[in-house]
Amino acid sequence: MKKMNLLVGLFCIAGLSSCQKEKSKPNIIYILMDDMGYGDLQCYGQQKIETPNIDRLRNNGIKLTQHYTGSPVSAPARCVLLTGLHSGHAQIRANDEIASRGAINSHDSMYVHPELEGQYPLKSGTMTIGRMMQNAGYTTGCFGKWGLGYPGSEGVPGKQGFDQFYGYNCQRQAHTYYPPFLWKNDQRVYLDNKIRDPHLTKLDEGADPYDEASYRKFTQNEYANDLIFDEMIHFVDQNKEQPFFLLWTTPLPHVSLQAPERWVNYYVDKFGDEEPYTGNKGYMPCRYPHATYAAMISYFDEQVGKLVDKLKQEGLYENTLIIFTSDNGPTFNGGSDSPWFNSGGLFKSEYGWGKCF
């Protein structure tokens, strides 16, 4: 994390001095993907997945080849990133759950009892990058996945340096992209989706795994990433006259494998037919696992392009610093196939795929 701390320090020195005029402060957008491998982008050697918008950012910017994650799994990696602390000093060091609260793994129970959601919280008064940016005069927003404090705790975004939040509070909820609710600040926003436990929902008994119709129940009405993106663009609209810090913690491309149909169809046409994923390695089944994984990344790349277009439209692009990375490297379950995509890139070894970016 020395590289990360150095970068943040330079940004503070160069852009956040209290003697600067407000208009001269750069907007800062930090994009954090979830379980995306070093080799999943074209600009890092990917041959199958198309990422033209992210590549364009790289071509006009700096490629970081030694920008390492602080931990190989989600919550501690995010804790290290937000606090700048080494994992040995970080408050959160694993994806541990607070089982003493009750039926935390029941999505039906979480729907009724919000106190069963979420993970171990950051402590009150923790110096996070969000709080640091607030102290420097920035309006701060976090959009996507949190996982650093259950609802009502001291670890929620609003108590950790973020003026606005929209997305998933709980990592377990983020294992489906069609959740029954999301969070807007400290309020639940209920969606037009049924409760589908991503770890228990399987193909119906006797269903044909090669028939697309067998998978229809895994696609619902409101795709969380669309809603998160819309709220994020609204945040830019609201704060375009003042410096803002935007932390975009998308849950993509973490499994379950779920993507907009138009992008899945694009890659089915490109890759051809393939063996379905029936759920034998956890998470929800998927008729076209390779096509869907690629679709999730290209869909997000499309969103990055739309965000850049918005910044240019509002005259903000030239005064905005955009940083793009992943919380850790590629996963191995849920139908993902890191070897097929060469997702680990340079970090492949005889012992497996390095979870770093």
PLM regions and their residue ranges:
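Formylglycine-dependent sulfatase
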Residues: 2-7, 11, 19-357
